[in-house]
Amino acid sequence: MLQLSCTQKPASHDRQNGSKRCHGKGDFGMKVAMIGHKDFPSRSGGVEVMVGGLAASLVRRGYEVTVYNRGLQKGHNVYTTEGVQARSIFTFQKASLNAMVYSFLATFDALTRDCDVIHYHAIGPSVPLVIAKLFGKHTVCTVHGLNWKVDKWGGFASAYLRLGERVAAKYADDLVVLSESEWNYFQEKYDRTAILIPNAVQMRQPLPCNLIREKYGLEAGSYILYVGRISPEKGPLDLVEGYLKAHTDKKL
């Protein structure tokens, strides 16, 4: 899954307060830092897949990209993959502190490395975006969902996620959303015109389905496939309920 850069709603976007566009180095050679994912390279989640594809794509276009991973591992704290430099940042394993501690420390590190653009992924890690702004950095926030709506986040965590949302809406030079519903949300709640860039998939050569047939006994058109995280907000229970009501002989 990659993030395309060709879809926008409306056709152009500039903050009403006249925020600057980030040029000055002819774009090529520009230093970009990415903060918010858990690991790189990784396919553990949508954020990680998108960061991996976007970072590698920018490197191929001549940008210098640093991605900040969460957690320190002996001997693997700084490494380069596909031309992308990955730096691991200490953080606590406790879920309520993980993204918060990591995003602040990663921001401070990025500020010491003369990055031109700091790109935050998800609203939780975007709280220190305002610090990057104070240091004159061009900031981008890609909203990967309104995480405070997820049932597992309550109390302090939910309030912190809402804070990240407000910071991104008010201070990010560029605010990117992945769906029209989120575009409408930021327009209506914050009067903020975001950039709509839906996620996309890489087209690959189709492979024969022998393995699926041999391993699972499935034939084309004989099953319904759900691909996604098993969590309430993804609606798997709705899928199961609908499947039972359909009285179909297809496998789920």
How would you describe each model-predicted region?
Residues 51, 224, 239-240, 252:
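A structural motif in glycosyltransferase catalytic domains
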Residues 108-111, 134, 158-175:
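Membrane-proximal helix-turn-helix segments that form the acceptor-binding/catalytic region
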Residues 82-108, 151-157:
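A short, charged, and often flexible helix/loop element on the N-terminal side
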Residues 206-218:
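A short helix/loop element that forms part of the nucleotide-sugar donor recognition site in Leloir-type
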Residues 181, 200:
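Carbohydrate-associated surface elements
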Residues 33, 218-234, 240-247:
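Conserved donor-binding/catalytic core segment of Leloir-type glycosyltransferases
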